[in-house]
Amino acid sequence: MNSKEITTQISKAADFLNLKKWDYGASFSNDYSVQVDKGEAKQLKASQKQILTLRVWNESNLVGITTTSDISESGIKKALNQANIASDFGNKNERTEFSPLAKDPIEVKDAKKRNPVGIKKLLTILREAEVKLLESHESIKSVPYNGLSESFYERVYANSDGAFRSYTKSQAALYLYARAEEKNKKPRSSGSVKLGYGVEDIDIESCIKDASNKTISHLNYSSIKTDKYLICFSPESFLTIINAFSSMFNARSILDGVSLSNKNSIGEKLSTEALN
């Protein structure tokens, strides 16, 4: 059943239950991943996931919400009925409405459609990559952490007001983490990650080279002289700091009263002058 058919199914079920206002968000995905250990398959995984989150408004305009993975006719009716029952316990202090952007088209960068290569092909590619990485330098003794995966997913939103938005995407990732050992030196490890829309987009040779060079470079270590050093933080480090305190400006946390901020905090400083 595709997303259009699911939307039609939900609409019919809502009419049957006499539910006038509803919306739903859905996520469908197919994931494949492999790991190897010295040429042998260590882990092979394939999964198919589907989850629907449905909201129903009652006559008092209170919202009830439920989730389900059962997209059969009976499963959808049951989920809508549960959301309708839950709406009786909706928060009267928060009146939720459809987003004004619900009917706007989603701007998605066009990309060539990728197809799954399958578990067997993933395993073959990763085995070859492991062998090449081990052969790239005599000091690299193992590749303890590695993985090759591909995911294909679809996101959908639709409501009783006629909105329907969806997009499909794919992604693939290769991860190689090598361990090098030399006499009278501590073992050192490093790795590399490459991403792409599909496995065919990943530069496998570059990933092998990066993992090898980084790992070997770590063997040439020496102690750092105790002294005072000027440290320059990257822009990303400040984003990490802000993310660590994200509850300060998370809307849900503010509404629930578990944030240091409140509804009147807009415009106030978040940091000290030293960080500014």
Predicted regions and their residues:
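Active-site bordering "gate/hinge" segments
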Residues: M1-N276
